[in-house]
Amino acid sequence: MARKISLDMTRNVGIMAHIDAGKTTTTERILFYTGVERKLKEVHEGQATMDWMEQEQERGITITSAATTCFWKGHRINIIDTPGHVDFTVEVERSLRVLDGAVAVFSAVDGVQPQSETVWRQADKYKVPRLAFFNKMDRIGANFDMCVSDIKEKLGSNPVPIQIPIGAEDQFEGVVDLIEMKEIVWPVDSDQGQHFDVKDIRAELKEKAEETRQYMLESIVETDDALMEKFFGGEEITKEEIIKGLRKATIDNTIVPVVCGTAFKNKGIQALLDAIVNYMPAPTDVAMVEGRDPKNPDVLIDREMSDDAPFAALAFKVMTDPFVGRLTFFRVYSGFVEKGATVLNSTKGKKERMGRILQMHANNREEIEHVYCGDIAAAVGLKDTATGDTLCAENAPIVLEQMEFPEPVISVAVEPKTKNDQEKMGIALSKLAEEDPTFKVRTDEETGQTIISGMGELHLEIIVDRMKREFKVESNVGKPQVAYRETITQSCDQEVKYAKQSGGRGQYGHVKIILEPNPGKEFEFVNKITGGVIPREYIPAVEKGCKEALESGVIAGYPLVDVKVTLYDGSYHEVDSSEMAFKIAGSMALKQAATKAKPVILEPVFKVEVTTPEEYMGDIIGDLNSRRGMVSGMIDRNGAKIITAKVPLSEMFGYATDLRSKSQGRATYSWEFSEYLQVPASIQKQIQEERGK
């Protein structure tokens, strides 16, 4: 069966933003105007198609990235609606990895908010081309120009308006299209925004439109020498040349086109769809896919993005579906695959059989026979494939670049309400951990408790909620615990001779290491053994011993991070030496060195942004200071004060309630993980006492 829509007419885009900027509503409108939805649905009524989990509909926020497909002007658009809440960063990260472009939705009232910055940085990491949609133009305080300068200043990008708004707040009627130089106006009685009028630009907007168009043209020609020559030579630049130049500059990440509207009031969405089709890349616009040879990871393999190349795909999400079981979402980067085919999971070196293949529309599904290059689909029946694994043709193995996920920052102990549910809880937690790489489960060796860790209180709340709804396991949850870490502040030279003789064969391992701080590098092991003083086959055992010793630090038993170990000398015994002996020697050497290397405890610190009426500002700043917060800035916006601070996570529990009472419910806050920093000596002592160390 041949593909229905050619690859160059396909767009894979994500809708990304800060929580509450109106992402899901924007996506719902896109589905309505492209004919997928028969009736408009509202997020605040809990009806949104893309928010299909019960918890999402209750809370009115998006937790998982729902994938859906729609069609516009002969193009196929695969859309992923990503969460905006900081606790679900992993969903954004894995979506961006498999997309070709992204629509960044901003609230025209609030501009760039903390989570917008986080998501923007994630998109920078994967070099994802973007266009900006300023939503909520009908709301009080909407300010188009402020949003443009916010993107420039806070995100360091080059926003170029290709529209300007007609009116704002309750006077917002539509937009001026700066390429066509026409007004697009949605009448008040328009049939749910489906019909609009295209008119000549009114006199009072002419000057502003000409001025902004000139800026748009100058920005485009700066990226193209031939156009620049033509433009400054006084020649007219055609509409086709503008679109082509803008498309190239967007794909090259030198320009971010800006459009605006109000999704809730049904204005501006059709023009946004035109911009997606005109300026977002097709899979063919993106460079060749690069991967590595599974047998020799140093060898790079280039793979052409075409249906004729060998099959290669990346699994970017695993989830359990109540009807079909385990679903694996994947993006095809080259070739095609049909249902029932056997493919190779090159990350794990295992063969997998593609059972049914489903095209997802939020949580509705349509069975399909084939998936072609550039498409996103979900497979049933992949038993061993996890997020980030590569699936490929058996005769052309390749491993695509994997995704990196942040480590959890918060933990709680959970136990089932009834003893009978112990086993069910174990199964539920392991299934949920399979779906979400930032959710970890472990058993505390000292207490025997089950500890779950994640990206924030909301993240873990939803996990506990899902256990109850999907797996019928009710649980008691302990107090939140912060994921502290340990590190060292100076270098140390350490020698350990591990020798054991108790009749028969003994144990002998002798190592000399240097342990030194290695900020931001987690763990690094360097082998400087020469002349075979330690045989080559024992070196990995020393590294393994060091790695195991890192799991429990020397101050309070938290993981030891950001260290470098150099193995430079030692000795062995012909008969008594073994891998086990060298592993124990490596572990002992690292522990002893860490004790002498001035160890310290690190704590997760969050960037917090509080928006408050001025009269509560003093109390709120005082409260942040009392939480060991460092206030770094204050600005005015729309009559409110915005306070920025860095606050340790351990001081943020219960903050939402305190903030409500201090501001009579009028202040709001958002936060995102910033970094790990050393705790003060008094806090370190307190942590040690609590841990009984």
From Swiss-Prot:
The keyword Nucleotide-binding applies. PROSITE patterns: G_TR_1, G_TR_2. GO terms for biological process: ribosome disassembly. Pfam families: EFG_C, EFG_III, EFG_IV, GTP_EFTU, GTP_EFTU_D2. It is found in: Cytoplasm. GO terms for molecular function: GTP binding; GTPase activity; translation elongation factor activity. Residues 8-284 form the tr-type G domain. The keyword Cytoplasm applies. Belongs to the TRAFAC class translation factor GTPase superfamily. Classic translation factor GTPase family. EF-G/EF-2 subfamily. Catalyzes the GTP-dependent ribosomal translocation step during translation elongation. During this step, the ribosome changes from the pre-translocational (PRE) to the post-translocational (POST) state as the newly formed A-site-bound peptidyl-tRNA and P-site-bound deacylated tRNA move to the P and E sites, respectively. Catalyzes the coordinated movement of the two tRNA molecules, the mRNA and conformational changes in the ribosome. This is Elongation factor G. The lineage of its organism: Bacteria, Fusobacteriati, Fusobacteriota, Fusobacteriia, Fusobacteriales.
